From Swiss-Prot:
PANTHER family: CHLOROPLAST ENVELOPE MEMBRANE PROTEIN, CHLOROPLAST ENVELOPE MEMBRANE PROTEIN-RELATED
Subcellular localization, as worded in the UniProt entry: Plastid, Chloroplast inner membrane
Protein name: Potassium/proton antiporter CemA
Role this protein plays: Contributes to K(+)/H(+) antiport activity by supporting proton efflux to control proton extrusion and homeostasis in chloroplasts in a light-dependent manner to modulate photosynthesis. Prevents excessive induction of non-photochemical quenching (NPQ) under continuous-light conditions. Indirectly promotes efficient inorganic carbon uptake into chloroplasts.
Listed GO biological process terms: potassium ion transport
UniProt cross-references to InterPro entries, sorted A to Z: CemA (IPR004282)
Keyword Transcription annotated: no
Species whose genome carries this gene: Physcomitrium patens (Spreading-leaved earth moss)
Membrane topology: Multi-pass membrane protein
Keywords: Antiport, Chloroplast, Hydrogen ion transport, Ion transport, Membrane, Plastid, Plastid inner membrane, Potassium, Potassium transport, Transmembrane, Transmembrane helix, Transport
Main localisation: plastid
Catalytic activity reported: K(+)(in) + H(+)(out) = K(+)(out) + H(+)(in)
């Protein structure tokens, strides 16, 4: 046990050195990214727009992550250093009153050992400061040079290397739709690459871009799935459930949330009374059942039923609060991850457009039939009914029928507009295959 506590104590003492080492490694990574950028710089202008924007977004994201790690580690370093300096000063003051030998031991051994580490820490701090200053100058120089080069070609394809949030620049990691089909531009770009002898470097670039898009998209999808669910579940267990139980059982005297629950409880109570009478009659068929015993048993069953519906009302409120937290967390992930969302959008579009025309039409037909097919109203009724029961509302047939009769029609209109407006310009063959399979 003593060895375990000594390990924890030594780990805490090494916190300033560990955080500074993390910041130092991040500054080294910045230098490595800058060296790789020189390789991208040779072919970035001659590459396609998709490759160019994805490379710039990839490098800018990595640099921002490294800078965030550096500043966060330096903050941890300063806080931990201030805390341990305060402890050392306090120990030295106490040792002067109690034991002069303890004071000499600290001043002679510990401080001498700290001097060597302080020199190394100062060197690392100087390196980190120089790396950050050099990064600012480097960003300014390359953003200005690339903006001046691309401004002569087109304004739409200009992508500076400054912070995207400060300049409100929205980028996409895929090629936008233009007057000239993308297949023609890609063919001309590939032909130009073969003539200039840059195919090997561009293949490596495309592979790195594809790997980055896939990893970033999968990571963002995992974030969308697990972060809202995990945060809402932890908040439900640690805060919402204890607080809501205390408030509901202390300050709230109402058991039912709405009339729907009261009707269900009344029907259930009538069934319980009938079952109790039936059991007594079947057991004591020769004797007349006593009304006092029946009233006591019915009273006990009623108390159990009240506890059950009180717990159901509490769970309904708890589910509602948890769903609100889930929606807020999911919205925050969408807002804070706009760049990752653009990468995910480009990755999904690349996967979709890489399919054959038959598979594209099959995917569209499958999605439309699931949402707005002839059998979809029954599925929508089940979904809406389950959602209303989850929120504790009554199963209203009029509301469900109104929703089922209008919402699939809106979805059908949106699908048709998307096919006519967007898909027909990108690939008319997909639209022709879709209509053929649909007929």
């Amino acid at each position: 046990m003593k060895f375990y506590w000594s390990q924890i104590y030594s780990w805490l003492l090494r916190t300033p050195y560990r955080s500074l080492e993390r910041a130092y490694r991040a500054s080294k990574k910045i230098q490595h990214i800058k060296k790789n950028y020189i390789f991208y710089n040779k072919n970035i202008i001659s590459s396609s727009r998709r490759s160019w924007q994805a490379i710039m977004l990839y490098i800018n994201t990595n640099l921002n992550n490294c800078v965030f790690i550096i500043y966060w580690s330096l903050l941890e370093y300063r806080i931990s250093l201030f805390f341990f300096d305060f402890i050392k000063t306090f120990v030295l003051i106490i040792s002067n009153f109690f034991n002069s030998f303890f004071s000499n031991l600290i001043s002679n051994n510990v401080i001498k050992q700290d001097l060597k580490e302080i020199k190394q820490m100062n060197k690392k701090l100087a390196w980190i400061e120089a790396s950050l200053n050099d990064l600012d100058m480097w960003k300014y120089y390359y953003s200005f040079s690339f903006f001046s080069k691309e401004k002569q070609k087109t304004v739409e394809t200009s992508l500076t290397f400054v912070d995207l949030k400060k300049n409100n620049v929205t980028t996409a990691a895929y090629e936008s739709i233009g007057l000239v089909p993308r297949s023609i531009t890609r063919t001309l770009s590939g032909f130009k690459t073969e003539l200039t002898g840059q195919s090997t470097s561009l293949v490596l670039q495309d592979f790195q871009i594809a790997r980055y898009q896939a990893l970033a998209s999968l990571q963002y999808m995992l974030f969308l799935l697990f972060i809202p669910w995990g945060f809402s579940s932890l908040l439900k267990i640690w805060f919402l459930e204890p607080w809501l139980k205390n408030w509901w059982n202390t300050y709230q005297y109402q058991i039912f949330l709405n009339s729907f629950q009261e009707e269900l409880a009344l029907k259930r109570l009538q069934q319980i009374e009938e079952l109790v009478w039936l059991d007594k009659i079947m057991v004591n068929s020769l004797k007349e059942p006593q009304s006092q015993d029946l009233n006591i048993e019915i009273h006990q069953k009623t108390i159990q039923l009240v506890k059950i519906y009180n717990e159901n009302s509490l769970n309904t409120l708890l589910h509602l609060l948890t769903d609100i937290v889930y929606v807020i967390t999911l919205s925050a992930v969408f807002i804070l991850g706009k760049q990752r969302l653009a990468i995910l959008n480009s990755w999904i579009q690349e996967l979709f457009y890489s399919l054959s025309d038959t598979m594209k039409a099959f995917s569209i037909l499958l999605l439309t039939d699931l949402c707005i097919g002839f059998h979809s109203p029954h599925g929508w009724e089940i979904v809406i009914g389950s959602f209303l029961e989850h929120l504790g509302f009554a199963h209203n047939k009029h509301i469900i029928s109104c929703f089922v009769s209008t919402f699939p029609v809106i979805l059908d209109t949106v699908f048709k507009y998307w096919i006519f407006r967007h898909l027909n310009r990108i690939s008319p063959s997909i639209v022709a295959t879709y209509h053929t399979m649909n007929e």
